Amino acid sequence: MSVSAVVVSHGHAAELPLLLPALAPQVDEVVVVANRPGSEPAALPANARLLVNERPLRLAENVNLGTRATSGDWVLFANPDTVPEPDAVAALASFAASRPRCGIAGPRVEWPDGTWQPTRRRFPTVSGTLVRRTPLRLVFPPLERQRAHYLLDEDVDEPVEADWLLGAFLLMRRTMLEEIGGWDAGYRHYVEDIDLGYRAMRAGWERWYVPASRVRHDWAQVSDRRFLSRHTLWHARSMARFVRGHPETLRRG
């Protein structure tokens, strides 16, 4: 089996010297999509290519663009702020290949200090989203009050099937992407990973958390810094788009 990696750089040139040397030896090819001026890496590994956009595109558009430029049986999307441990990709690919209906696999993601990040999730509910994205989270801390959403009662050291996985580092089966139409380019920012997991689920594909694979993620969590910002507005609009596209999710609460 072959693995192609797609990295989207939107002004992330400074982070690529950490990611690319760690990622490139683990995959067959890497495509870096530079989405705006100043996004190009200073140097490319031998198995990497650069695509430079004439105008900025949305994240999902860039992922689809990079995917079309690759040929691997599996497509790995990696955020510029991630750094995989040695053999992280092999661990993901080995597990995913052992399950014929595994369409998406995600690693154990950790903060730079080694603390586990809760990247495996259940699909959001209306009530849960309101708590997480409003001042209510100060009264009802999500990681304490929404254990089911974050699968906190599951062992972090054991594989578990999740509804969706945070889109920082995802291994995706190409046949699944082709079947469901890739990433939904209608999202401006945020929720693309939730939508991807939901459409994969509807098509009968599994989504797995694989802790044998470890990735460091220096996540800024921009959308959580302030209650009123352009990022929270983008997130709200994306959630509204998700509900419009999948109105049956409203029945979840």
Task: Identify the residue ranges that each predicted region occupies.
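Conserved donor NDP-sugar-binding/catalytic core segment of glycosyltransferases
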Residues: 83-119
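Acidic donor-binding segment of Leloir-type glycosyltransferases
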Residues: 20-55
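Short, well-formed alpha-helical segments that are part of the catalytic scaffolds
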Residues: 7, 12-25
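A short, conserved alpha-helix in the catalytic core of glycosyltransferases
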Residues: 155-157, 163-181, 186-214
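Short aromatic/hydrophobic "clamp" motif used to bind/position activated sugar donors
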Residues: 75
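Active-site-adjacent helix/loop segment of glycosyltransferases
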Residues: 191-253
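Glycine-rich, basic loop-to-helix element that forms the pyrophosphate-binding segment
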Residues: 53-70
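Short, flexible, basic/aromatic active-site loop/helix in glycosyltransferases
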Residues: 124-162
